[in-house]
Amino acid sequence: FLTTMIYQVMKDYDFPYKVYIDTPLGIDIFNEYRKILSGDELKLFDEVLNWDNLIFVRDAESSKALVHSNEPCVILSTSGMCNNGRIRHHLKKAVPNPNATVLFVGFSTPGSLAALLKDKNVKSISIDNKQYTCRCASFSLKSLSGHAPFCQLLDYYSSINTNRIVLHHGSEKAKLTLKEKLTSELEKKCKSTRVIIANSSLKISL
């Protein structure tokens, strides 16, 4: 989706920079995504795939070469928390560079590398046991998250029939808020479903 947005914005402006998709899983998803599209959506997707500026980085050696390149470009790489994957190598170069911008899409777990980069009060970060001074710009596009919004979670989980719902993903504060609101919605629908917040000692019998 982000790739399509970049294409739609830049295609008519003689955009001079390459857009690299540096994620093996992401490339596989591109291929699968094309199988489910049809009509105008498929036509637009094919336009994006055939865009001269778009380059897929499939192997590790090509990714390493991109890291060491000084070419101005856009790099799309997965790992929302930045804790694993190729993105870490790109960050080692981008973070101390005042001319670089790191753009996040969606939620990042508190304490993760991504969350630290989003925090304007953090002056340096550690990647693979080496400190990097934060000189790059960083922004977050919360509107592009692939996660369901709070209201949709309430609607869905309060509509299903089950004995219990276990909340696992997310920060403790967010899970506590969801538990309280969801319990209230379930009670309004005369349901006795238990809402449980998972922790490391919780054991569930299936």
Report residues per predicted region.
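Acidic/His-rich, metal-assisted hydrolase cores and their charged scaffolds
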Residues: 1-206
